[in-house]
Every structure is written in C-alpha cells, then in structure tokens.
Amino acid sequence: MTEQSASTTVKITTENGLHLRPADLIARRAAEFESAIEITKDGNSVDAKSILSLMTLAAEKGSELAINATGPDAQAAIDALAELLINDFDELHQTNVQEE
C-alpha cells in the first residue's frame, strides 16, 4: 500500500494565537489519526501530536502554519486540523461555555 500525503496552510485568526488550550485541542485531534502530522511555522516543524512541541511554535494571531501529514489517513487528518484552526477552535469556545 502506498503512503498518502496531504498538506495545507492556514492562518491563525484567534486573538491569543496558539496558546495552551488550543495546542491541547490540536494535539488531541492529531492523536486520533494514524498518520504522522507536522505543523510548520517559519521553517520550524513540530509533531502535531505533542502539546509542548506545538507551544514552541509561538504562533501568534496572523501566523501562517503549514500542516503536513503522511500515512493512511493523511487527508482526513489535514481536513480535521485545518477545520479546527479555521473555525477558531470552536470546541474550545464550546468548552468555555459549558464550564461557566
């Protein structure tokens, strides 16, 4: 079976950028996939399944992130992570509402 690969680029639009809670959401979502997933900012690539690695990107509002995946579910992984980033971490907002 041939390895699939997929990639996309997204821009961080949330006011606080990629802080701990969004990094946690990304890492948890990425962990649902078998594919290897990397996120790159300014030439620095990190494992999307690692919260600490994601934090090292220091991605602020307006930062462009390249998401690359290789593996059997690469396109699904890219789609899921891009959706999370494009929708300003909707799950985070829903969690905040439920906690209040």
Regions found by a protein language model. Name each.
Residues 16, 44-48, 72-79, 100:
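Low-complexity, flexible helical/coil segments
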